[in-house]
Amino acid sequence: METRYPQQHLIPTFLKNLASHLYRSYPSLCLDGDLMSEDKSLLDLTTAHLNIGLRGVPVGTCRTSYVTPGEGVHYCGYPIGELAMMSPEDIVFLLFHKELPTLEESVEFRKNLQSRGELPDGIEQVLATLPKNGHPMDWLSVGIHTLGMLSGVDDWKEDSLNLIAKMPRLMGLIFRYREGRVSNIPADDFSLPLVGRFTNTLDLDGIDKAVMNRVLSTYLVLHMDHGGGNLSTFTGKAVASGHATVYSSMAGAMNALSGPLHGRANQSCFEFV
């Protein structure tokens, strides 16, 4: 009998916003009490609600995660405490397939992502033109849009996998180009896991990469899927509702995340860690 593989190996806040694309055609498997199938009133909407930026207004549900008072966040029924030390790749597999991978599936999924990781020609030329005083989230939005223009295939699943695979290198290059460290950039090592490719591109002096990989991997797993109602996820859904591409939707979500009332929470969490 096959056992599901809780791998203890060593990807960015943007992943949690992919739920609006990855699961819009899937049945609800994860909502506590199957909330989405119930016909129930959640809010008495008044004219006052129209002028408060949707504060306190339920705007979405999530098919992949839910929260309980005792165990906190669950991904597809698994308490986050059971997943925190697993590899980001295995959690991405979980969010796609609603179950953890076997050892064989884990290996094959990693190979799949590795085959998609190379950035298209033209990305670095675009990054080289951006103002160094620009906010990194603005750089990220431009980078995601550029990826879509250069390598989008207009298939939500393929584009999602491609974006996941390309983000570590893109984000590492964004840091380097903003800081002016554009010489001696290490080649992208596709044999490394996703987080390892990011830290390899950063190539920071005096940093224990093994420790950094472990911290970033756990951090990313913890932030990978947090429900359907936060600002960036809502924004991504709104853009996607017009049948925009995955890249346009994710860029819009990152623009929403850039504001201090939303993204600052992630930054403060990382500073705490």
Regions found by a protein language model. Name each.
Residues Q8-H9:
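Cationic, low-complexity basic patches in intrinsically disordered or flexible, solvent-exposed regions
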Residues F14-Y26, C30-V273:
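Hydrophobic alpha-helical bundle cores within soluble ligand-binding/oligomerization subdomains
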